[in-house]
Amino acid sequence: MEEKKKTVIEVRDAKKVYRMGQEKIKAVDGVSFTVEEGEFCCLLGTSGSGKSTLLNLMAGIEKLTKGEILIKGKSIGKMNENKLAKFRQDNLGFVFQSYNLIGSMTALENVEFPLVFKRIGTGKRRKMAIEMLKNVGLGGRMQHKPKEMSGGQQQRVGIARAFVARPAIVFADEPTGNLDSKTTLEVMDMLKAMARKNNQTVVMVTHDKKLTEYADKIINILDGKIESIEIQPNSKEGKFPEYEETPAEEKKTEKPSNPGKKDKKKDKASKVKKDTVFPNLEDIQSEVEATQNTGGFDLQYETEKLEAAAQKLIDEEKAAKMAEQDGLSEMISEDTNNVS
């Protein structure tokens, strides 16, 4: 007899109503369902059906008008902002249509970043991030920044970042919306394979019925209500890339500068720099706590603030090094906690 799977998400008569003047709009209207551990669940619907609003409610991004949502047995509607933010950090991961990578950081640093908030040491988090980037076929692009990567590559970094801290649940909102058809299938393969590897739950919003072939459960949403729920015991499985992308410049074979001796030249695009500047753990943690105290914090939804904080710390560290060389260390700004 097959063992019954553990329920990790339970939605009970969820309702979300918006007001536009005197008019009430029922974005989510009395929805109830469960999602089990390790399940790949798709919320399928057309634009305006309420599927993204439902995802935001499940993730605690928006508040219910009525009803209740339990994540891992805990009612998220009863949590205050700080407890909810901490709960999301500990249990949830996010993949977005717009990638939401931090532009001033490399692929490796973007994947490492969620681990900072778990107070994981530099060496361990670096190792975890490298492993995740290799899983998604980007071991050769760890030092590339978002602007140096294609949309598909950026989304793979986003997937690696979402899964690196091993969250119980990953929410994905139209993760292939900005990708071409070939890259879409590659990303879906990786998303499903990553979830299966550690028995993680994925809830994905999509308008594309073709993508639901990867789903174990399909919840069809229409006008804020559940039209039907389909179970697919033989859903399409995913796979990790069978190759590792390498920048074109690395593919050129070069003769050793001194035959007979090991060539010491290293391509900086493919190697992890030992001296990569990464925000000090305690400093960036204080930035997070300061943000939490002003109304709640979520890693992916606060990327602009985090980018500003991270870039400021990076700039000040560089400035401090320059000042030391010039004997001007006393003139370095001390207001690193003031992030707007």
What is each model feature region?
Residues 29, 61, 271, 311-312, ...:
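Short stretches within intrinsically disordered, low-complexity N-terminal or propeptide regions
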Residues 225-256, 260-268, 273-276, 296:
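Conserved beta-strand-loop-alpha-helix hinge in the C-terminal portion
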Residues 297-310, 316-340:
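Long, low-complexity, intrinsically disordered segments
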